[in-house]
Amino acid sequence: MYVVAGHKGHAEIVAKLGRAGRRRRLKGKRGRGTLTDEKPPIFGMLQRDGEVVIAMLPNVQRVTIEPLIQQTIQAGSRVYTDEYDIYNQLEQYGYTHKTVNHSASEYARDEDGDGFHEVHVNTLEGFWSLLRSWFRPHRGISQEKLPRYLAFFEFVHNARRRGKALLASLLAVLVTP
């Protein structure tokens, strides 16, 4: 029987699911994941200059995601998202909110006519590609350890952007008695 990576080491979960094995080549069901499913949702926010915040969430409901957005993103900031309905109320919280409509094959939009496509989420899509390729050699990560892997990847990604300033602050902490 094929065991999904999120259930590795948890025979009681697999037995409780009572599901038959599946072929590896078949794609899983499409849609947004939940912790009770085999693919927990990972939420990410990325500044255009490269700083990223990622977190594994129990679900993708507005009550879960909006507090995280409000804690992380300063009011008055521009926020670019897809048209998922949980983002509809961002303007009520003081954000300038622009969307791209992926279902209509819109991936970037030039709003002011200068030839530069300002409205897009391609930077974050590129980050997800990096994260997936980084996960690939691990061949499955349990749901218990996934937040640690995410935190490590977030740290490495952000530290790479900070460079010498991060190294200097780490050394200052280590040297200070």
Region spans (language model):
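Residue-level recognition of single "structural anchor" positions
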Residues: 1-177
